[in-house]
């Protein structure tokens, strides 16, 4: 009966996991039973009770014919080989049998390792040991993006790009050279938006390739000066350089130096220039030195109040700058030995560079800077200190405009005095003056002629013509009131001209620009 009951249980579908649990439990129970029985037999033999108690057959004899439980007693394990579930991790087998040798255990461990490697390859798993590249930190992570550093910096805004509008960026990026047929007239255009065929004259493919190359060849290196915006002053004047100053002086016939002090510089330093008697060597700011004779005659001069106003508004260069410019222009005779006699006899424009100040021929630099006209001012070693001093002083100066030169060339003060009869300085000055006062008056006229906003000769002539036309219409009403209206008309016209001139120089206030926009639309 027992055999009949055991056979159907063996044929049932048994789960491998439950089977391993059952086998472990049954084997442990049977081992415990056999051990208990053997211990009882040993105790009986020692005590002499073997004869009194009958011996029971061992469990091995009962299970000899049972193949199902025989593998459990021999501590063999049922291995279920299947590749259907490679993701399950099988526990390593524990071989505790003392009958197995070391070589057999090593082979089994190697087989287990091979199984694990094969399984990891099938799954696509990564190795347990991470690579060194994964653990390393990039050097770009060390850049501080919160503060301004040297890298990375965007290109400056003033770099010109050949791209069209921002809406056509996709079209520009995918733009290709047009495909031309042998007749070079039909062109097929294909882009993301549409596809069309155009009929027209042939394109020059060489020029098209050149434009593509130039648009892509952006300079990789940018200077630091490109990031600094050039804050140009309101007056659109060119910066003073020694080469430009020498070229202008060579074209002029007179000894006049076409320089003047900037407005901002004259307003800031007008009080310091009055009270200072020594130049500042640190900032190299020129100061006007007063003569002792002028200080003595200040009390006797009746035109002191006019002179003070002129000194405040006058922006002509002081004597110290004028002397410095004269020293730069007047080269000593010893420097003539630097000139090349062979090149001087030829009527060919040579590419030999010379020093800006001493005009010494620089052969080595001219050989290196061949066919490059970007450098206008080159200084030798002996003239570096003089050049730096001149450049520091010229920062506060600017070139005179053509309007200022015309004002200086024409006798503006005399023409203004003749055109406007009621406006002259002789009414304010006493009639009885000595020769010293007359000399001061002449000097005063010369200083006024150098003023910035003085009237030009053309403007005064036009005003005189307008006044003559008005006089013809009101000849019969010529009286004192007419004389007053005549001077008033001249004053209004002069004020209008001044406003127009101020608007050109950028001196008109903002609140007057919109109000007087219609009035100031005047063409000289």
UniProtKB/Swiss-Prot annotation:
Q: Where does it live in the cell?
A: Cytoplasm
Q: What else is known?
A: Present with 195 molecules/cell in log phase SD medium.
Q: What is this protein called?
A: Uncharacterized protein YBR138C
Q: Name one GO cellular component term.
A: cytoplasm
Q: Which UniProt keyword terms apply here?
A: Cytoplasm
Q: What is its main location?
A: cytoplasm
The answer on whether this UniProt entry bears the keyword Cytoplasm reads yes
Which residue intervals make up region (Disordered)?
83-108, 155-179
Q: Which organism is it from?
A: Saccharomyces cerevisiae (strain ATCC 204508 / S288c) (Baker's yeast)
The annotated regions of Polar residues compositional bias extend over 83-101
